[in-house]
């Protein structure tokens, strides 16, 4: 009996430690296909390695929020960190600037990563 209580206690302590860990999100912004001005494409913002799972993601065009973006299901990795993909259709031009803005408890202010069409 004492052994099973000890095991349960250790499991609960381990779970509490996992839940207390905070990890800052890694952000990657890229297009599905090589960009061509005037040709429809998809803009992706892949956010990974974050914990806890509460997060806000916005895609931006020239600093303004793009409405009605799509989001994948929130998933987790082997290390219990989370990842998610935000994406939308877009048509790149020479002058438009696209970015992804992420708000998370580990960030003092929202982090914005600009799409680099040459990457």
From Swiss-Prot:
This is Beta-2-microglobulin. PROSITE patterns: IG_LIKE (PS50835), IG_MHC (PS00290). Disulfide bonds join 45-100. Keywords: Disulfide bond, Immunity, Immunoglobulin domain, MHC I, Secreted, Signal. Residues 1-20 form the signal peptide. SMART domains: IGc1 (SM00407). The lineage of its organism: Eukaryota, Metazoa, Chordata, Craniata, Vertebrata. SUPFAM superfamilies: Immunoglobulin. It comes from Rattus norvegicus (Rat). The gene is B2m. Heterodimer of an alpha chain and a beta chain. Beta-2-microglobulin is the beta-chain of major histocompatibility complex class I molecules. Forms a heterotrimer with MR1 and a metabolite antigen. One of its GO terms (cellular component) is external side of plasma membrane. Its main location: secreted. Residues 25-114 form the Ig-like C1-type domain.
């Amino acid at each position: 009996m004492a052994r099973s209580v000890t095991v349960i206690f250790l499991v609960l302590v381990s779970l509490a430690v996992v839940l207390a860990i905070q990890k800052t999100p890694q952000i990657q912004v890229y297009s599905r296909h090589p960009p061509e001005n005037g040709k429809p494409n998809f803009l992706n913002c892949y956010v990974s390695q974050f914990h806890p799972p509460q997060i806000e993601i916005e895609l931006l065009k020239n600093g303004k929020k793009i409405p009605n973006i799509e989001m994948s299901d929130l998933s987790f990795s082997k290390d219990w960190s989370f990842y998610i993909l935000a994406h939308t259709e877009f048509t790149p031009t020479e002058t438009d600037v696209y970015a992804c803005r992420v708000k998370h408890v580990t960030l003092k202010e929202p982090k914005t990563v600009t799409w680099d069409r040459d990457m």
